[in-house]
Amino acid sequence: MYLQLQKVRGNKFLATGPTNFQAWSIARFIEQVAAAGKAEYPLPLYINVALRDPLTNPMATHYESGGATDNVIPIWKVAAPSIDLLAPDIYLSGSERILKVIDLYTRADNTLFVPEAGLIADNAKYFYDVLAHGGIGFSPFGIDDNGDSSNDEHLAERLAPFAQEYAMAAPMMREMAQWVFDDKIKAVVEHEDGAEQSIKLGAWDAIIKFGSGRGGELKPNKDHNGKAMIVSLDENKFIMAGTNCRITFRPTGSNAGKAWQYLKVEEGWYENGVFKSLRILNGDETDWGGPAIGDKPRVLQISLVVR
């Protein structure tokens, strides 16, 4: 019956009716359970979503239809109001596909929360993008498992990219929460083609190139795991974090085309709401294509000036 309806031309309801009906039915059942639970113990509730491919609009026979997939989010929001968050489990592959999921589940009525993601090194690069979308959690599956002691080395290798990001973020979690609330965080992740990307920052554009090395051409990232996050503190001052990337800037607006320079670039961390400078990067570390960050995340405070 469903396959026959898919062949109907010119009638969107007939083509999507079974999918929508399935979503409505399951969501209404979940709503009864959730509402009863909240009546006894009013905790916030979320559901894990087994995703469909957000780029290809696959037939319902090719994914777990009935769940809160991107095509039926509005139905779930109406049918299951006791569910506070529709939370995507990210087990898809490909940066374009995953970034699309992050966009689709960031809504005025749905704060982004990633309760599961594959415990693979590549997924660590999406941590910044989740933050930039106002996300309140990013939890790779099994990250809290001690694992098999006979395979500790392999487990440590898989956990390291996530552990390093969380260690970097931990001292400035309160600042990050405020930056997210104020919509000050911008992020990019490296795509499979390794192409450079840019971020608009008001009076400046930030240009991020991915790879390793300082000066000249960067050595491409084998695993395409580069990423960068930039926070606007004021018009000419920024916090940056990232891995396997290099950043430079370009003035825009009335200053477009003018000469500019780094006034100061400091590496450091936040402590009790204050940036603590560990060291000031010298000219050789900033002038040859901009500050570069290797395979371990660092936090930089960057001040710029137009000459």
Report residues per predicted region:
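C-terminal beta-sandwich/jelly-roll accessory domains of carbohydrate-active enzymes
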Residues: G215-D223, N236-R307
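Polysaccharide-binding and catalytic clefts of secreted carbohydrate-active enzymes
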Residues: M1-I73
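A generic short-segment signal for beta-strand/edge and adjacent turn/coil regions
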Residues: L14-T16, P54-N57, I83, D109, ...
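Short linear motifs at secondary-structure transitions and domain/linker junctions
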Residues: F21-A23, M59-E64, P88-I90, G202-I207, ...
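Catalytic-core region of carbohydrate-active enzymes that cleave or remodel glycosidic bonds
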Residues: A34-A39, V72-P171
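Aromatic- and carboxylate-lined catalytic core of secreted/periplasmic carbohydrate-active enzymes
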Residues: Y128-G253, G268
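Short amphipathic alpha-helical surface micro-motifs
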Residues: A27-R28, G67-T69, L119-D122, P220-D223
